[in-house]
Curated annotation (Swiss-Prot):
Tissue-by-tissue expression: Lung, spleen, small intestine, pituitary gland, adrenal medulla and plasma.
Organism this protein belongs to: Oryctolagus cuniculus (Rabbit)
A GO cellular component entry from the record: extracellular region
Keyword Secreted: yes
Protein name: Corticostatin-6
Keyword field: Antibiotic, Antimicrobial, Defensin, Disulfide bond, Secreted
Cellular compartments annotated: Secreted
Length: 34
């Protein structure tokens, strides 16, 4: 799924951890699904 990372959008790979992959290189915090 897709979630908003503060002012950006990325693919949320880990919904439990709340982290997503950006540009396939860096990891940023994403909105976690409750």
């Amino acid at each position: 799924g897709i979630c908003a990372c503060r002012r950006r959008f990325c693919l949320n790979f880990e919904q439990f951890s709340g982290y997503c992959r950006v540009n396939g290189a860096r990891y940023v915090r994403c909105c976690s699904r409750r």
